[in-house]
Amino acid sequence: MDRQSYLSELKEPVMETQQIKETIEMISEENLDIRTITMGISLLDCVTGDLQTTADKVYAKIMAKAANLVPVADAISDEYGIPIVNKRISVTPVSLLAGADQNLDFRPIAQAMDRAAKDLGVDLIGGYTALVQNGSTPAETALMKSLPEVLDTTERVCASVNIGSTRSGLNMDAVKLMGTVVKEVAMRKPQNAMKLVVFCNAVEDNPFMAGAFWGISEGDVAINTGVSGPGVVERAIAAKPAASFEEICETIKQTAFKVSRMGQFVGKVAADRLDVPFNIVDLSLAPTPAKGDSVAQILETMGLSHVGTPGTTAALALLNDAVKKGGIMAAERVGGLSGAFIPVSEDANMITAAAKGQISLEKLEAMTAVCSVGLDMVAVPGDTPDATISGMIADEAAIGMINNKTTAVRVIPVPGKQVGDTVEFGGIFGTAPIMAINDGNAQQFINRGGRIPAPIHSFKN
């Protein structure tokens, strides 16, 4: 082989017949898919002194930039035989768009976002967001207080609030407020709480809902993709029942590479056809309630009798790290949350474990120290006190703050339900057993107010 041929092969690696066959099997038999193509759109140029005028400009820009998102994604899916499950949009945090209007009524912008999402045919639109890790402006406070009504009167708008970071500490005033807000959101309709995430260390390029927003350091518009393939990873591990931990890690890495390569390919093709930049691939393993599409099942295939048993956190740490190591080699740029999601209601084996009492909130919290995000799609009794929800948020945020990772809470207090009951959300949102929650009282702690300072290791300069 001459030098030119060698360099050409380095630039464009040849996919062997066996690898092609494996990828086809992943799609047809193991639930491999592109979980989302998400277009990020900056709305900073839509700001005016009048919220209704701003809302009109928001609608116009989203419609202009994302006009071909759904047709292009559908065409790529048909052309290459790769399922693309969701087409989504993330936008600039809405709290940044309204500070010049004294009314601070965000409903016109939320309605404009919802109308654009429906008119374009996208599944969800994220970015009804406030970033309050250092403190809250009047606009940000108004946005947080508007969440119960906005999430009840829109269908496709998703919201998030970042209440802390490793560099800033935790805004406990915002934590207290969000405990009340989450409860009010769920009291109107439990499903509304599925569209709200409370973060610590939120990332600016997350393509997954409900926590996606388009950060202010991002460009005007770009494409992000989120891949998924728990079934692919599980089958690869199942084929090696006697493998050592090193061999399991290597197997996961090789599988994650193939999965992420597909995400890179689809994202690049979509960006090229839409004539916008390609940004990142999110390497997350995102489960669904479908059989064989479970992150918990991967952990059980490693040798656990059920998720939640001692060893679960170690198995999840191994999985999360190996997915990152394998996927990062496959993509030009990796970002988002990138890891393994453990949403209770969206994972068939997690649903089973929760229903049988085999996994507790405390064990889930331990798992969040090593997984992609945090307490996700957790249903709790409807009479759970606001302060208890604030305490859950504070605990998760503290894990993220100290460990310099993204953590989050998407908890759903279900009116009229108690431990042992279940609630049906339907579709990819699945079934949620109502989980027991510690009945202690955190009210005095939450009422102290102020901020929990940033950890000592946050001072890097």
UniProtKB/Swiss-Prot annotation:
Pfam families, sorted: DUF711 (PF05167)
Gene3D superfamilies in the record: 3.20.70.20
InterPro entries the UniProt entry points to: UPF0210 (IPR007841)
Family: Belongs to the UPF0210 family.
Subunit structure: Homodimer.
Designated name of the protein: UPF0210 protein LCABL_10110
